[in-house]
């Protein structure tokens, strides 16, 4: 396995270079702006390429070291893509709504996850003895909890890295990550504040094709990390295993 490859052409075809209208910009993004066309800022892809490569390396390294990556993207055009990418790479996701305290109040979130698991058990049991109305209420509760927490139910604790689409919309998630010292990889559009992001990726965060490209690359970087981790585990096992020594032949038995 190796880090996923991508080209400038792919970025252009996905519309990664298109920012927002010039009047909507965040002046802190000036270093990443190439210019403007028809009152729309054009993001400097010559900077996006190395910064995206660095982000992919961080994701791979985190997973290779046994870390967990949380994908966050709750807006309509990112929601399904985020979930698919996280599932494909055996990572975790929040794609419906970020609940305040999702990271900083993990104990409460854990209790809700336990409740979700309990509901799964109850509803899976044929001999539960509930009325139709009671069962319907339990199913609604489970659906609500699963929509909010289904992507992190098996995470087992706070993540080691977060990947975020739309830093303006996910500002609470970023604040919580900062408070806990969790590094953040995020796409920063021309209307974003790059200061809060540890590993920024300058680019369009609205176009579905662009979002799909980022998520695919991040997922593949995580898969590369898994392969590296398994490879290292295999080497460790190989190094620790004793090489069997064949017994020396008895000269008398050769005769």
UniProtKB/Swiss-Prot annotation:
Give UniProt keywords alphabetically.
Ribonucleoprotein, Ribosomal protein
InterPro entries in UniProt:
Ribosomal_uS2, Ribosomal_uS2_bac/mit/plastid, Ribosomal_uS2_CS, Ribosomal_uS2_flav_dom_sf
Location of region: Disordered: 235-255
Pfam family example for this protein?
A: Ribosomal_S2
From which domain of life does this come? Bacteria
List GO terms (cellular component aspect): cytosolic small ribosomal subunit
GO BP of this protein = translation
Q: Care to name a GO molecular-function term for this sequence?
A: structural constituent of ribosome
Q: What is this protein called?
A: Small ribosomal subunit protein uS2
Q: Which organism is it from?
A: Sinorhizobium fredii (strain NBRC 101917 / NGR234)
- Which family does the record assign? Belongs to the universal ribosomal protein uS2 family.
Task: Enumerate the PANTHER family for this protein.
Answer: 30S RIBOSOMAL PROTEIN S2 PROKARYOTIC AND ORGANELLAR, SMALL RIBOSOMAL SUBUNIT PROTEIN US2M
């Amino acid at each position: 396995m190796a880090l996923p490859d991508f080209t400038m052409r792919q970025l252009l075809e996905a519309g990664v270079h298109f920012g927002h209208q010039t009047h909507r910009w965040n002046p802190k993004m000036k270093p990443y702006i190439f210019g403007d066309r028809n009152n729309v800022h054009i993001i400097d892809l010559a900077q996006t390429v190395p910064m995206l490569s660095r982000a992919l390396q961080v994701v791979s390294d985190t997973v290779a070291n046994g870390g967990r990556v949380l994908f966050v993207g709750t807006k309509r055009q990112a929601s399904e893509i985020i979930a698919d990418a996280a599932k494909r790479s055996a990572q975790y996701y929040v794609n419906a709504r970020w609940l305040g305290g999702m990271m900083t109040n993990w104990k409460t979130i854990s209790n809700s996850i336990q409740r979700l698991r309990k509901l799964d058990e109850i509803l899976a049991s044929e001999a539960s003895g509930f009325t139709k109305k009671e069962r319907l209420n339990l199913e609604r509760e489970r659906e609500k909890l699963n929509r909010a927490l289904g992507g992190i139910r098996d995470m087992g604790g706070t993540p080691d890295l977060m990947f975020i689409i739309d830093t303006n919309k996910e500002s609470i998630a970023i604040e919580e990550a900062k408070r806990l010292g969790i590094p953040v990889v995020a796409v920063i559009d021309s209307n974003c504040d790059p200061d809060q992001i540890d590993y920024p990726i300058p680019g369009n965060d609205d176009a579905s094709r662009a979002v799909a490209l980022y998520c695919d690359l991040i997922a593949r970087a995580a898969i590369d990390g898994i392969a590296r981790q398994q490879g290292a585990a295999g080497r460790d096992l190989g190094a620790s295993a004793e090489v069997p020594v064949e017994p020396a032949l008895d000269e008398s038995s050769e005769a």
